[in-house]
Amino acid sequence: MLTRKQYELLLLIDGHLRKTGFSPSFEEMKAALNLKSKSGIHRLISALEERGFLRRRHHRARALEVIRMPEAASMPVPKTAPSAPSFASPPAFTPNVIQGSFSSRIAGVRAAQDASAVQLPLYGRIAAGMPIEALRDTSAYLSVPIDMLGNGEHYALEVAGDSMIDAGIFDGDTVIIQQSDLAENGQIVVALIDDTEVTLKRLRRRGKSVALEPANERHETRIFPADRVRVQGRLIGLLRRY
């Protein structure tokens, strides 16, 4: 029989996989289960592996696979529903799904040959480490499933660096950005610093300052006066090649 925490984590991972196609990050799991450290998540995952409920796909990011769920008789009753906590996390990691007819064009995209996909401009590499200048090479386009996109204009960027790995964003990943100059606290954004540098970080407003937070303890949070940072878009999706 699983412990309550093991069962809650299994439900959490299964729900996230069904919703997004990949498992939640360790930070999201830690927050959802109200644990103080990621080591607790590691222990729970190892226990679920040993009992044959989970499988880890090694050398892949956020690659947990639910093999089976416990039978009803052996399931503990969780104190709270595991899908309720903000593991759904920053809105950036829950891509909007467009409902209804897709016969009309979406602003900012080109139609792809596949009716279920559109082509977004691929603007180059963005730093998830030290900021680098984004390239606007609009001769490159990327085919993206249409249900990843919300309203408005979108573009894609390739990630360079490792400062967002705890948010499940790795060097070489392609991020899908919804163009916007507004973002809520905690959202992962494309930030333009001093009109010269572009970086992908989590945004935090602190009075008259803006903090750009990494998701890797080896990198430091950078804090700027609010007038030095402009939001260029919000992260809504991620593509990865294996």
Curated annotation (Swiss-Prot):
Organism, as annotated: Granulibacter bethesdensis (strain ATCC BAA-1260 / CGDNIH1)
Quaternary structure, from the entry: Homodimer.
Lineage, opening ranks: Bacteria, Pseudomonadati, Pseudomonadota, Alphaproteobacteria, Acetobacterales
Gene: lexA
Homology family: Belongs to the peptidase S24 family.
Entry protein name: LexA repressor
Task performed by this protein: Represses a number of genes involved in the response to DNA damage (SOS response), including recA and lexA. In the presence of single-stranded DNA, RecA interacts with LexA causing an autocatalytic cleavage which disrupts the DNA-binding part of LexA, leading to derepression of the SOS regulon and eventually DNA repair.
Pfam family, one: LexA_DNA_bind
Keywords per UniProt: Autocatalytic cleavage, DNA damage, DNA repair, DNA replication, DNA-binding, Hydrolase, Repressor, SOS response, Transcription, Transcription regulation
Site features described as Cleavage, chain residue numbers: 128-129
EC number(s) given by UniProt: 3.4.21.88
Record bears the keyword Hydrolase: yes
SUPFAM superfamilies (UniProt xref): LexA/Signal peptidase, Winged helix' DNA-binding domain
